[in-house]
Amino acid sequence: ALGAGVSENGFVLKYAMPDMSTATGQEKPDEDPVSVLTLSGRDFQEIEAVYNRSQEKFLDLGHLEVLILDEQILEEGAREALIGYLKQEEHIGEDVYVFRTDMLGDVFHWKGARKSSIGEYLQGIQENRTSGQQKKGVTLREVYHQFCQDGTLPWLPEVWVEGELLEVDYGSNE
C-alpha cells in the first residue's frame, strides 16, 4: 500500500512494505510482517530522491494494490500535484484501489487479524467476496478519468481504525 498526505513542509508518502520472508512462509515469530516507511519532502520528486538515497531496495510500485489518501491531499492544489506524480510513475497500474482517511498513520500501522498488510486486507475486501457481497471500489483509472474531465476526484471509500478493527465506508455503494 502507498499512502499520501500533506505535511508541514510539503508532502508525505507512506510505504507499507510486506516482509518477503513472511510472504514466502519463512517468518520469524517476533518479527513484524509489515514495515511502514514514512518520508516527507517539498514535493514527490524530493521524497523519491530521499528514498533512493536511503533504501537498498528499488521502489517497485508495480505491485501496488491500494492507495490511501489523507483528507488534506484531496484539496485543490495538493490533488493536482499528487495526480501529476502518479501519472508519471509508469509502473503504477490503473487498477489500484483508492481510499481516503483522516487517520493515515493509524491506518498504516493497523495490524490485521492474520497480520496481513493494509494493502492485502483492503484488496481482499474488494476481491474475495461472492458476487452479491462485493463492494464497489474506486480505482485509479476512475480517479484519472474524472480528474481529466473536470479537475475533481470521485467520491472515495473512507477507511479508519476503530479500536482493533479496520472499518471501511463505501457510502451508498454498500
Residue ranges and their predicted role:
Residues 1-174:
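Membrane-proximal alpha-helical signals and transmembrane carboxylates
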